[in-house]
Amino acid sequence: GSGCHSLTLQEAGKEVHAIDISPLSVEVMKQRGVRSVSQTNLFNEQFADEYDTILMLMNGSGIIGKLENLPDFFRKMKLLLRPGGCVLMDSSNLSYLFEEEDGSIVINLAGDYYGEVDFQMQYKNVKGDSFDWLYIDFQTLSIYAAENGFKAELVKEGTHYDYLAKLSRQA
């Protein structure tokens, strides 16, 4: 990202370590004044520090990619979180995209999860590789969290099918 959340937390006196897989994003964060930045993938085995809070904002669930990656995500969070730590993650429920005129929602239950999206970035004539991105509804997130030793709490519901969740390890 651009580091806006990291900068706000830094200015509030918090110790912050930002990561991104994009070398350009890492460079932007450094130029903007984020003091501790690494170019890495959250799922990289070498990324193994411990944290009190892990912020995954701006549809932060996206980097998980697919529902099938959620167990790996929760395993990684168990390694990264200090005792009593939490993940603050936001996402959106894309079910509204499948809403009919009568208000019903028509989703192919035999197909892929409706929140699994294939993204490809483009700026002018430069196209990046496509990548998986996960938008997950809170109920599904809660189920996967419980199955993997975490509790999901709804912190705030947004105005357009979006929400902020807190994920904590269950005792």
Please give the residue ranges for each predicted region.
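Conserved SAM-binding loop of SAM-dependent methyltransferases across substrates and taxa
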Residues: 2-14
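Conserved SAM-binding strand-loop segment of SAM-dependent methyltransferases
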Residues: 30-44
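A short acidic, Gly/Pro-enriched loop at the edge of an enzyme's catalytic core
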Residues: 43-54
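A short glycine-rich, Lys/Arg-flanked "PGG" loop and its adjoining helix->strand segment in the class I
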Residues: 69-86
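Short alpha-helix immediately C-terminal to the canonical SAM-binding loop
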Residues: 26-28
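Conserved SAM/SAH-binding beta-strand->alpha-helix loop
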Residues: 22-23
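SAM-dependent methyltransferase
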Residues: 83-142
